[in-house]
Structure formats: C-alpha cells, structure tokens
Swiss-Prot record:
Name the UniProt record assigns to this protein: PDZ domain-containing protein MAGIX
Residues the record lists as Phosphoserine modifications: 272
Limits of the PDZ domain: 125-209
Annotated InterPro entries: MAGIX (IPR030031), PDZ (IPR001478), PDZ_sf (IPR036034)
Keywords: Phosphoprotein
Organism domain of life: Eukaryota
Region of interest: Disordered: 1-26, 209-306
UniProt feature, compositional bias: Polar residues: 244-260
PANTHER family given in the database record: PDZ DOMAIN-CONTAINING PROTEIN MAGIX
Ranges of Basic and acidic residues composition bias in the record: 1-13, 209-224
Record-linked SUPFAM superfamilies: PDZ domain-like
CDD domains linked to this entry: PDZ5_MAGI-1_3-like
C-alpha cells in the first residue's frame, strides 16, 4: 500500500483502517466507514474484502471524525499479493450446510451407532452422545413397577440423539446400560446409572418379537368363528342333473302336448317316440335328481311330474281315457 502522505509504505498493508493516517499515528480502534463512496456499516466482511481486492494495490484512506455508525466486528483486509494472504470465502456456511445434510454419524452431539443387529439373536448395541437436551429418550419399567416390568424405551424426543440414531424404537427392551445389566434395577437406579456414564451412553437393546409382523394368513384358510358359506347357492349350470331339471320345467311350460300326440299314445301305457319328442319326458338325469337321498345343497328338486289326466284337464284337452270312452260309446251307438 502507498499512503499519499509520503511516508514509507507499510508492509502490513491496510488492516481494517489501522494503517497510518495523515494527521496522526495508527489508532487501535479506527473504523472504515466508506470504501469507493459506498457505506460499509451494513456490509458483510466478504463484500468489503471483495471491494478492497477490486481496488488494486493502492488504497487511499481519509480521516474523518467519528460518526454514529454500526459497531460491527473488526474487518481485516490483506493484499492478496502478500505472502500470507487471508482469503475470505463462504467455507463456514458451506460447512454448516454439510452438517445439516450429513448422515447421523457425522452430526455433533448425535448418536454413534454400533454395527447392525444380528437377525438371529435380535440383540444390538447403540452408542449415544449427549446433546443439548440430553440423550433424547425416556425409559419405563423397572423392579419397582407392578409386575416387575422390564426396562424399555417409552418415547423418543424429536430431533434428539436417540431419534437421529435411526435404530431405536418405542418398545425396545434395554438389557445393558454402559456395560452393566439392567436386570433387577429399579427405574431410579437405571436413571442414575445413565447420569453416571457422562456424555456417552452405551445401550444393549433387544427388540421384542411381538413388534415383528406375523405370518400372513393363507388364502384358503378359513378364519376362526366364521362358518364357510357355499360359493354359489344356485345349481351348477353345467351339471347334468340340474340341466335336465331345467329342461323339463321349460318343456312343461313351453311345449304342451298336442292332440295328435295324445291320440297316438292313448292305446299304450308307454309314451311313443313321437310323444317323447313333443311332450314332457323325464330323462334319467331327472330321475337321479328326484332321489330323496340326494343331499346336494342348493338343488331345487325333487320335481313332481303331473299325470296325463291332470295335464289334460289343465290344458283343456281330452285325455286318452276320455277319448277311449267316447270311441267305445260311438261304436255301441252304431
């Protein structure tokens, strides 16, 4: 730096306005109020350092009476061409961002966890480091509790070391505290043992089997207390028995016997082939469906087939017996 007063150049450069002034010697508390006609009271140290480096190797200082300015922290500016230059950057802020985004193993005052628990034993260890609010967990149980309840984790403080550890859950059983067994300890003794351990806490945890999801129920396994219902109360349309029953019922309604059929069958007790084709018939599957021992659930039978006489009366057609009587009466008359 070259001061305009003509004195020897100060090899230290300008340190926050502490260089020689035209009217007096160096001052211990001298504020740098303006730089390049810009007020510096509300500027950050990084901005001031950038302005000074932009000014080059020459920095002109002018003394001014003290005014009411913001009493900020000392700002040290060093010429970047000097051997031991101080370069101000955003590294503190960068480190803070790294801390926020870092995994739990790198956060200060966090939990340092041990290796992952063994799947076979279910035991694992966790090491916690005390934070500003403690270890961040609450314990419950102990010998003094009714029934001698085992010591277990009852709660995790939000953003506490125990929660940031990511391995503790509510309901985990605490087997050891700082290498000593918790069997037979009261709740007060367990808390005292944690306090006596200092800023670090080493726990051996066992996760109860009840917290693990159980075996899924089979697809075809019925539930207890539930009576299995039939999948379909209606008869199987593909079965021969019900198919015959349906065809017989349909033929009774839609295909009444004709007079010619009745005339052809009046002389024989057995129906003729023509009558079997036109009139209602009972097929072997129908007879099988009429079996009283048939216990198939949902079957509509047994079917009742009306006699020829009743069918003739219902349809208003003369029966075979009536036709035979009329024929006999006609012969007698002749």
């Amino acid at each position: 730096m070259e001061p305009r007063t003509g004195d020897a150049a100060d090899p230290r450069g300008s340190r926050g306005g502490r260089g020689p002034s035209p009217l007096a010697g160096p001052s211990a508390r001298q504020l740098l109020a303006r730089l390049d006609a810009r007020p510096l009271a509300a500027r950050a140290a990084v901005d001031v350092a950038a302005l000074v480096r932009r000014a080059g190797a020459t920095l002109r200082l002018r003394r001014k009476e003290a005014v009411s300015v913001l009493d900020s922290a000392d700002i040290e500016v060093t010429d970047s061409r000097l051997p031991h230059a101080t370069i101000v950057d955003h590294r503190p802020q960068h480190r803070w961002l790294e801390t926020c985004n870092a995994p739990p193993q790198l956060i200060q005052g966090k939990a340092r966890s041990a290796p992952k628990p063994s799947q076979a034993s279910g035991h694992f260890s966790v090491e916690l480091v005390r934070g500003y609010a403690g270890f961040g967990l609450t314990l419950g149980g102990g010998r003094d509790v009714a029934g001698d309840t085992p010591l277990a984790v009852r709660g995790l403080l939000k953003d506490g070391p125990a929660q940031r550890c990511g391995r503790l859950e509510v309901g985990d059983l605490v087997l050891h505290i700082n290498g000593e067994s918790t069997q037979g300890l009261t709740h007060a003794q367990a808390v005292e043992r944690i306090r006596a351990g200092g800023p670090q806490l080493h726990l051996v945890i066992r996760r109860p089997l009840e917290t693990h999801p159980g075996k899924p129920r089979g697809v075809g396994e019925p539930r207890k207390g539930v009576v299995p219902s039939w999948p379909d109360r209606s008869p199987d349309p593909g079965g021969p028995e019900v198919t015959g029953s349906r065809s017989s019922s349909t033929s009774l309604v839609q295909h009444p016997p004709s007079r010619t059929t009745l005339k052809k069958t009046r002389g024989s007790p057995e129906p003729s082939p023509e009558a079997a084709a036109d009139g209602p018939t009972v097929s072997p599957p129908e007879r099988r469906a009429e079996d009283p021992n048939d216990q198939i659930p949902g079957s509509p039978g047994p079917w009742l087939v009306p006699s020829e006489e009743r069918l003739s009366r219902a349809l208003g057609v003369r029966g075979a017996a009536q036709l035979a009587q009329e024929m006999a009466a006609g012969r007698r008359r002749h």
